[in-house]
Amino acid sequence: GGSATGYLMNAVEPDVIEERVAEIETTIGPIEVALFNLGAQIGDRPLADTSYKQFEMGWRLATFGLFRVASAVLPKMEERGHGTLIVTSATAAVRGNKGQHSHAAAMGGRRMLCQSLNAEFGPKGIHVAHVLIDGAVDAPDTLGKLLGPERFEQLRSTMGREHDGLMLPEKIADTYVHVANQHRSVWTHEMDLRAFSDTAWWNHG
């Protein structure tokens, strides 16, 4: 049981992230666990079709957005001596595929930023975890919109549901809860998640 509150924001606008963090800390209470789950996928584009604006947008969402959240949240956690920041990432953080110039650069930056944040704040009692989502997630609002209703439903019928070939958001959430509750003597910094039937990113030819 419990309650939840949602907010809409444009994460590339100045001050909106910082103001929302301050509001939550004041009106709801101290942030014990922060989850950064902002995507930055603009699709497959050859270099010639990737504009400066599109490339920068990936960085603003994936890397600079995390920097802003960390800058707003981690100092408060440091004052309290504990806290957790879990960062959702993608295979692009460790492998740059053709046509993924913006996404790979942005996610690679996200991963390195997580390592830097962990080096600074881990010894201060703050758990920073970087989670690679190495596969397709059964999410109508993201993958469904990317593929379109017909292709998404076809994918669900062949790989999802009882086939367990698409990652279920609620099972990802279970894993995040586990990470958030880890004892500090056994903290996970980086982990990767995928369906049992998927080939791990390092085994792709």
What is each stretch, according to the model?
Residues 61-79:
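Amphipathic alpha-helical dimer-interface segment in Rossmann-like NAD(P)H-dependent oxidoreductases
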Residues 84-109, 115, 119-122, 137:
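Catalytic loop of short-chain dehydrogenase/reductase
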